[in-house]
Curated annotation (Swiss-Prot):
InterPro entries linked: ADAMTS/ADAMTS-like, ADAMTS_ADAMTS-like, ADAMTS_CR_2, ADAMTS_CR_3, ADAMTS_spacer1, MetalloPept_cat_dom_sf, Peptidase_M12B, Peptidase_M12B_N
Tissue expression: Found in cartilage and skin.
Biased composition regions of type Basic and acidic residues, renumbered to the chain: 1185-1205
Residues annotated as binding Zn(2+): 398, 402, 408
Organism: Homo sapiens (Human)
Leader sequence residues: 1-20
Protein name: A disintegrin and metalloproteinase with thrombospondin motifs 3
Cofactor(s) listed: Zn(2+)
PANTHER family, A to Z: A DISINTEGRIN AND METALLOPROTEINASE WITH THROMBOSPONDIN MOTIFS 3, ADAMTS A DISINTEGRIN AND METALLOPROTEASE WITH THROMBOSPONDIN MOTIFS PROTEASE
This protein's GO CC annotations: extracellular exosome; extracellular matrix; extracellular region; extracellular space
Location of the PLAC domain: 1015-1054
Length: 1205
């Protein structure tokens, strides 16, 4: 690279005069030839910084200056945008930081050489006498904040590699050419505000002799005669490489990292200048990295700088032997191996060394030298490159390709045809290349060797750095945290000590120690707060080094809360907390969301329609001031869809739009154009007209969900009137439900159109005192578009209208006719009673065949054919529908055209990542992956082709996994039949452990009790009481004690009457007697449960809730696994209810068909039956009350149901 500003002064030669004593730090006189003719085509440009849309921001370009510039208002600091206009083209560059170019901890070393006269020979060049000592003069971190990569906006297949350390410098690869850009003068960062001139030139325009890369020296291992003496020195390293694989950290199957030591000799440093050479080298390596990211390579390789060494003068000339490339490469490789860090995990341990020089180490035209397949070798992984500007990046990429195993294209392979198109591994690098790419042979040769280069599998960006303390405040005092929060000089406030220092961090400055400030946050956990104590969760407590980290886990979901709206579709939520357990001591938070929602109250509101968004705006009328004034706020729909769930309102007085600084309420419609999608916590949720979340179902023109317009009618007409006096004059009405309403004047008129809500009397348009002007507004829950053009008014809304409206005119002149035409669409059931000539049926949807797509090309390249594919299209909205809607006999014949006429490149097998294993253990687990045959195209993209075009065996797409024995588990057999036919018995089953005594968990039970109907062998000998014939007591036959006493009467009634205890339960909680005081005195006694299968509409009652039915004083209670007091039959009855829904209900005083009055004596006599029985079970839907000594039956009619057993 040269100082191009000197070229413009037409200086043919520049003399750099220095003293010439040949020692370190002293340089001989050098003449540097700077012919302006070297660049046949170049342009001077002034790049600008822009935003994403390409709008000008500033002339600031450099990273160092951008930090100080107040005009840099880029919305995303992770992206930069620049505009460059050159060669008649606009390049809108979109850049992001190349965070993978410089490894963490990378350094730049400046070496210094001292030669001491003597008889000791140089260890590298035997023929030079003297003793050399080399020391590191200084070390500094390698700059990492100004390397960027990206592309050109809206141009596919482009790439950009640029640094902005000092202006813009790097490579721009467009769709048909490669360009280099660099500043005209260096070191002018602080003068960029006025614009900085850069030079842009084409790579193809660099005038130089074709570089014959066929002469570059790439030797095999047998050629390393000069390095035999290193076998012993590096034997241990080689063995270590074979025995110890470097850690493979997050490296994907096609993700490799070449960690580079960049050696730079003194000739390069002097040419570019010590203050600029680092920026230049960073740019150069950024370009090399981008070349290896080209998709044509087929493997993703990162070129990562871990160390850069700048050599002194004496060491530089000792390594390079003029005219002897093999000896020069041998010296460079030996030197690089001596720089290697012995620790494989050292951040500066390199995989490959790249050496740059401007010295002539070979014949004219030779640019680089490298061994083939030397990557990862302790000595052979190195290249020697002649540096000659940014185009040298291709030389470096070429030579590194040899080390990776690539041969020259056309030499020993069949890719000679690609050299003319600019392949990176072409033996002759021609100046006319327009676009570089990697040939198919380079990709194949790389894949042949890449898997053997284990050193490329580790990730330099994921080293095992020293473990950080679990508590972040351990390393920072309160004074330091104050300095971080408020700036230099601030310390912990000591003006008052009455507070716990861990509650809030208060800070003050020594200049005003009694003025304390806080950011309302506590100090970091781990901050020392007293001797032997630290802050933890806002408290100062004794230090405990054994605090265990605990990850969080979700607790159970709450019940769904109340609905956000009473009608018109609302939302209700349920939540869960991360407290089972909570994350503590640095543990992971719970994954996933802490809330769920569902739609509720989706029915339409029955009363007068109210706009939910309008209500929220109207609530701000009394207290929200805008520009120190209160307003009447109307709803406003923001044009940005992302902001429509934020509450924006429009002033009725001024038309100003104000943000109310809050989200709209859940359930508010996102848009007035979509009556179903709603806002949920600030996000628009898609809802179909079927009121299902995520549904795509839509209404037809008259509001039928999923309809086809068959029920739609169009109403239209013209109404003409001539006003005789001033004041509003009614023209006509438009009914509710109207959609796609259009009202317009037929001719220019001085009168003004007005619209009034018939239901409320509120003027929607042009009320009293309003100025008539074109506008879009929202009213009646819909959006209206009012337009005045050439004194002709028109009004349109998509509707639907929720209330009827009246169309009026405001006369401005008497005796001037006004003629209005109206048109709207409405459902046939809502058509108003008017002249039938004004009502026409809406046209049904019509369909036509339309070009849908083209078939896949018959050939992936080399010229094939494809045919048209036709689909059925609806004419009304041009949407594609199922082909059955179109007539098959009218389908057009397919049209043929040629395709893929580009020259063929060889398709390759590409395998994606393996999916998760289907099993965690056992013998049947497997995992799958997608394997495709992809053809690289000339535009840098890939195309999927048929597998027959890919050579070689198809990679496996299924493989076994997790084929390990599963932990032993208990196996259980089926339960046997009950051991008895009635009463209590037992059931048994077989329980086995297939692994002896090594099964996990507690052994399942093998015996359990079973309960069958009670045994009853007593014959019925007739009724034993006169009460058995009373109809009022007939329903007590379900009670075993009563049935036994009245067996004859009960058996007769069972065939004609439904069982009285099976009457359906009450439909409201008020109809269920839950207090024993409500029962007849004769029925108050311990009560068991009756199986009950009917459900109330309100909810089901589970066994776990039964214990609370009777209230705290109830006589009956049920708790699982508990034994109530009483006879065995009560216990068996509860067991029979095991898995059924049961209900405590009361016994009614009379059957549903009669009202019977029982005397107290009769009730007492009836109670004698139950005193002898073990339990009672009853059902009722009645609620009784006692008034004036009489029992009043308030029961409602009931339905009978059956009992399932």
């Amino acid at each position: 690279m040269v100082l191009l500003s000197l070229w413009l002064i037409a200086a043919a030669l520049v003399e750099v005069r220095t003293s010439a004593d040949g020692q370190a730090g002293n340089e001989e006189m050098v003449q540097i030839d700077l012919p302006i003719k070297r660049y046949r085509e170049y342009e001077l440009v002034t790049p600008v910084s822009t935003n994403l849309e390409g709008r000008y921001l500033s002339h600031t370009l450099s990273a160092s200056h951008k930090k100080r510039s107040a005009r840099d208002v880029s919305s995303n600091p992770e992206q930069l945008f620049f505009n460059i206009t050159a060669f008649g083209k606009d390049f809108h560059l979109r850049l992001k930081p190349n965070t993978q170019l410089v490894a963490p901890g990378a350094v730049v070393e400046w070496h210094e050489t001292s030669l001491v006269p003597g008889n000791i020979t140089d260890p590298i060049n035997n023929h030079q006498p003297g003793s050399a000592t080399y020391r590191i003069r200084r070390t500094e971190p390698l700059q990492t904040n100004c390397a960027y990569v990206g592309d050109i906006v809206d141009i596919p297949g482009t790439s950009v590699a640029i640094s902005n350390c000092d202006g813009l410098a790097g490579m721009i690869k467009s769709d048909n050419e490669e360009y280099f850009i660099e500043p005209l003068e260096r070191g002018k960062q602080m003068e960029e505000e006025k614009g900085r001139i850069h030079v842009v030139y084409k790579r193809s325009a660099v005038e130089q002799a074709p570089i014959d890369m066929s002469k570059d020296f790439h030797y095999r291992e047998s050629d390393l005669e000069g390095l035999d003496d290193l076998g012993t020195v590096y034997g241990n390293i080689h063995q270590q490489l074979n025995e110890t694989m470097r850690r493979r950290r997050h490296a994907g199957e096609n993700d490799y990292n070449i960690e580079v030591l960049l050696g730079v000799d003194d000739s390069v440093v002097r040419f570019h200048g010590k203050e600029h050479v680092q920026n230049y080298l960073l740019t150069l390596m950024n370009i090399v990295n981008e070349i290896y990211h080209d998709e044509s390579l087929g493997v993703h390789i990162n070129v990562v700088l871990v160390r850069m060494i700048m050599l002194g003068y004496a060491k530089s000339i000792s390594l390079i032997e003029r005219g002897n490339p093999s000896r020069s490469l041998e010296n460079v490789c030996r030197w690089a191996s001596q720089q290697q860090r012995s620790d494989l995990n050292h951040s500066e341990h390199h995989d490959h060394a790249i050496f740059l020089t401007r010295q002539d180490f070979g014949p004219a035209g030779m640019q680089g030298y490298a061994p083939v397949t030397g990557m990862c070798h302790p000595v052979r992984s190195c290249t020697l490159n002649h540096e000659d500007g940014f185009s040298s990046a291709f030389v470096v990429a070429h030579e590194t390709g040899h080390v990776l195993g690539m041969e020259h294209d056309g030499q020993g392979n069949r890719c000679g045809d690609e050299t003319a198109m600019g392949s990176v591994m072409a033996p002759l690098v021609q100046a006319a290349f327009h676009r570089y790419h990697w040939s198919r042979c380079s990709g194949q040769e790389l894949k042949r060797y890449i898997h053997s280069y284990d050193c490329l599998l580790d990730d330099p960006f994921d080293h095992d750095w020293p473990k950080l303390p679990e508590l972040p405040g351990i390393n920072y005092s309160m004074d330091e945290q104050c300095r971080f929060d408020f700036g230099v000089g601030y310390k912990m406030c000591t003006a008052f000590r009455t507070f716990d220092p861990c509650k809030q961090l208060w800070c003050s400055h020594p200049d005003n120690p009694y003025f304390c400030k806080t950011k309302k946050g506590p100090p970091l956990d781990g901050t020392e707060c007293a001797a032997g104590k630290w802050c933890y969760k806002g408290h100062c407590m004794w230090k405990n080094a054994n605090q265990q980290k605990q990850d969080g886990n979700w607790g159970s979901w709450t019940k769904f809360g109340s609905c956000s709206r009473t009608c018109g579709t609302g939302v209700r939520f349920r939540t869960r907390q991360c407290n089972n357990p909570m994350p503590i001591n640095g543990g992971q938070d719970c994954p996933g969301v802490n809330f769920e929602y569902q739609l509720c109250n989706t029915e339409e509101c029955q009363k007068h329609f109210e706009d939910f968004r309008a209500q929220q705006c109207q609530q701000r009328n009394s207290h929200f001031e805008y520009q120190n004034t209160k307003h009447h706020w109307l709803p406003y729909e923001h044009p940005d869809p992302k902001k429509r769930c934020h509450l924006y309102c429009q002033s009725k007085e001024t038309g100003d739009v104000a943000y109310m600084k809050q989200l709209v309420h859940d359930g508010t419609h996102c848009s007035y154009k979509d009556p179903y999608s709603i806002c949920v916590r600030g996000e628009c949720v898609k809802v179909g007209c079927d009121k299902e979340i995520g549904s795509n179902k839509v209404e037809d023109k008259c509001g039928v969900c999923g309809g086809d317009n068959s029920h739609c009618r169009t109403v239209k007409g013209t109404f003409t009137r001539t006003p005789r006096k001033l004041g509003y004059l009614k023209m006509f009405d438009i009914p509710p439900g109207a959609r796609h309403v259009l009202i317009q004047e037929d001719e220019a008129s001085p009168h003004i159109l007005a619209i009034k809500n018939q239901a409320t009397g509120h003027y929607i348009l042009n009320g009293k005192g309003e100025e008539a002007k074109s506008r879009t507004f929202i009213d009646l829950g819909v959006e209206w578009d009012y337009n005045i053009e050439d004194d002709i008014e028109s009004l349109h809304t998509d509707g639907p209208l929720h209330d009827p409206v009246i169309v009026l005119i405001i006369p401005q002149e008497n005796d001037t006719r006004s003629s209005l035409t109206y048109k709207y669409i409405i459902h046939e059931d809502s058509v108003p009673t008017i002249n039938s000539n004004n009502v026409i049926q809406e046209e049904l949807d019509t369909f036509e065949w339309a070009l849908k797509s083209w078939s896949q090309c018959s050939k992936p390249c080399g010229g094939g054919f494809q045919y048209t594919k036709y689909g059925c299209r609806r004419k009304s909205d041009n949407k594609m529908v199922h082909r059955s809607f179109c007539e098959a006999n009218k389908k057009p014949k397919p049209i043929r055209r040629m395709c893929n006429i580009q020259e063929c490149t060889h398709p390759l097998w590409v395998a994606e990542e393996w999916e998760h294993c289907t099993k965690t253990c056992g013998s049947s687990g497997y995992q799958l992956r997608t394997v495709r045959c992809l053809q690289p195209l000339l535009d840098g993209t890939n195309r999927s082709v048929h597998s027959k075009y890919c050579m070689g065996d198809r990679p496996e797409s299924r493989r076994p996994c997790n084929r390990v024995p599963c932990p032993a588990q208990w196996k259980t057999g089926p339960w046997s039949e009950c051991s008895v036919t009635c009463g209590e018995g037992t059931e048994v089953r077989q329980v086995l452990c297939r692994a002896g005594d090594h099964c996990d968990g507690e052994k399942p039970e093998s015996v359990r009790a079973c309960q069958l109907p009670p045994c009853n062998d007593e014959p019925c000998l007739g009724d034993k009481s006169i009460f058995c014939q009373m109809e009022v007591l007939a329903r007590y036959c379900s009670i075993p004690g009563y049935n036994k006493l009245c067996c004859e009467s009960c058996s007769k009634r069972s065939s004609t009457l439904p069982p009285p205890y099976l009457l359906e339960a009450a439909e409201t909680h008020d109809d269920v007697i839950s207090n024993p005081s409500d029962l007849p005195r004769s029925l108050v006694m311990p009560t068991s449960l009756v199986p009950y299968h009917s459900e109330t509409p309100a909810k089901k009652m589970s066994l776990s809730s039964i214990s609370s039915v009777g209230g705290p004083n109830a006589y009956a209670a049920f708790r699982p696994n508990s034994k109530p007091d009483g006879a065995n039959l009560r216990q068996r009855s509860a067991q029979q209810a095991g898995s059924k829904t049961v209900r405590l209900v009361t016994v009614p005083s009379s059957p549903p068909t009669k009202r019977v009055h029982l005397s107290s004596a009769s009730q007492m006599a009836a109670a004698s039956f139950f005193a002898a029985s073990d339990s009672i079970g009853a059902s009722s839907q009645a609620r009784t009350s006692k008034k004036d000594g009489k029992i009043i039956d308030n029961r409602r009619p009931t339905r009978s149901s059956t009992l399932e057993r």
